[in-house]
UniProtKB/Swiss-Prot annotation:
It comes from the Eukaryota. This is Vacuolar protein sorting-associated protein 53. InterPro entries: Vps53 (IPR039766), Vps53_C (IPR031745), Vps53_C_sf (IPR038260), Vps53_N (IPR007234). The lineage of its organism: Eukaryota, Fungi, Dikarya, Ascomycota, Taphrinomycotina. Component of the Golgi-associated retrograde protein (GARP) complex. One of its GO terms (biological process) is Golgi to vacuole transport. Gene3D superfamilies: Vacuolar protein sorting-associated protein 53, C-terminus (1.10.357.110). One of its GO terms (cellular component) is GARP complex. It comes from Schizosaccharomyces pombe (strain 972 / ATCC 24843) (Fission yeast). Belongs to the VPS53 family.
Amino acid sequence: MSNGNDNSLIIKNIGNNEFKFVETLHELLPEDITYDDLGSLRLSLSERLQESVKKLDANKKTYEDAKLSMGEKMDDLNSSIVSLLQELSTLQSVAENTQSSIVQMTSEIKNLDFAKQNLATSMTMLKRLQMLVTAYEKLRTLRQNQKFGEAISLMQATLQLLNFFKKYRSVERIASLSRSISEFQKSFYEQVFDTFQSQFKKESGMRGGFSPSSVQYLNELCRFIDIFAGDPPESVIRWYCRHQLEDFMKVFRENEEAGSLENLPRRYTWFKKLLQTYDQLHKPIFPPHWKVDFRLYEVFCEETKNDLSKLLKDDRLSLQVFVASLEQTLEFESFIDHRFYNTKSRFNSNFEPKERQAYNALSSVFEPHYTLYFNQQSQEFSILFENFALEKQTSTDESSQVLSSSIKLFQAYRKTLTQFVRLTRSSPLVGLKNLFIKWLRRYTQVELLDYQESSTFKDIAIRLNTAEYIYRTTIELEKRFQEISNKEFKDKMSFSEVLEVISSSRGTLLKFATGKFENVLNSDLEPLSKMDLKNIETVGDQSSYVGGAVQNMTAKASEFLSVVDLNMFARNFCDRSCESFTRQFLNAIYLAKPISEVGAEQLLLDLYSFKNALLKLPDLKQDYSITDSYINHLTIFMGYIETVLKTLLTPASPKAGFIQSYIFLVKDRSVTNFTVLLELKGVGKSDISSFLQQFSDFVKKTPQLEESSPIFKYLTINTAVEQAATRSRLSLDLAPESSRTLQNLGRLFTSKKKHV
């Protein structure tokens, strides 16, 4: 019963969207279905099919009815669209007619506006034309009566009216009137200019000078002339300047003595009097914006520059006259600067370039001729260096930490710069900088690096201090040059090239100091190289040479460290001393070979004394204490020597023990280095090949070894030893792993060559 209800539910779900055919079929036809159940299932499916057919018929009928209704509605819609289009066409026709009417009305209004505007313009033009004609007639009357003051405002109005009628020049009467007025203005201007010249000359020649009425009259003439140009009229100003300087030109150009550089102050005094005359008599005549006094200075400047250019090219010119003339010129420019720019300093960098060019025009003529100054200064520096050489021979100052000559050199530099900056701060300052660089280079070569092998450690330390002093002072000098120079030259005030030379000299001096110290170590360790370290039987106290060597080494280091200023130099010297000692000690024991186990133990004891002495090196400089980095540095290099000596402590027999000790301590695979240790150990040449064979076997089993230990960079290896090691290494590469004699290896190598 239950099964029938389930089937009914399943059959009802057959039409669903999520209907699953396979699963539904399995549910309707389970494995345990009976024949009776099939009949019932068939009946249910038939009923379901009939229901579906009925629903389908109903849906078809509904669709047909809807389709019929939709057709009727489409007919109505098409009819409505046709009607709407007809109405739109009618509206468009009405709109076009309306637009045409509006355009016609607007056009009529515009025509009325244009007519009104043209009428107003015509009235204005006729009125202004009447004004122009009236002004023209009145100006002609004023010209005849020479009433120039009254004509000023009327002429201004006439010029404005003429400017208005420029666009109407196509009208013949207006064009003719404009030409007549322009010709009148030109002739009127020339008449006023001529009147100004004659009146000015007349008043200048009178004993009483310019009367108030004549000043007013001349001022009216200038104001009339000023109307014709927005800028100051060049012709009037130029005439005035030439007129005022006429006597000046005659005196200083026609008379050779008056025009010489020695009489340059007279030129400047004369011009100052001209300016004084201008201030007292002529200033009220000219409009202020003409700046006639400055233009007078410009013309004077132009003429004086031409004269100075010729005078400065004279080969007979002395430095004394050159400097005196330049100083007088600078003093005059300072006066001009104060008058026209109202500044306290002649070197005010806020001036515009054009203004600087104007007030600095005279002194700039001297700039190409500063070679005369530089040559003289170079001679003075040459004499100074000769004195340095004499002082070097007679110097007895034991307390100085730097060469006194370096202080004197920079004192001379400061004195020269102080004098020079009063003369110029422009391009010649670059020449002075180059001169200073030249002599700084010379000083570095002659005073710092011109040392002898006989130079003491104190001498070297003083030179090193001097190099540092020069380096720091040159940087300050560079800053000073940049501060005082004009801003367009600041980028050219670099001392970098000579600073590199000085910096390089510090490194050279340090290298020389450590090289000299290494020579001391070489002499002190010479007894070690001659010791019999093979037959020594017992280890006692330190060897006899150690005390003297330590004492001498400490004394020489103290001689340098107690004088050198910078801790950086002291640290560098101490670091290099460790390296030098390592090199000399290893080379000494190499010369003292062979070394027995007892000999190696004795050397370790001796090394301890040297290590303590090297550890105390930084204490030899005042206010400088030992650092952890120096201790680490010393430990590394003493470790190199200790590694060699500890390897030599191992007996040569058994061979494997010595080889293992080498690999454990030295940690490299170099046949050359191992051969050196065998040499130091005193292994006979006949036994070396067997050592090398076993060494090769051990190396193959220890791939993590270095190619070569850094220890052997500090040991000078005999060329013969190196060649023997190379031959042995070649033999080992060709030999089989089994032990063979060198003769068999040689025959094998020969047979292989023939076979090839």
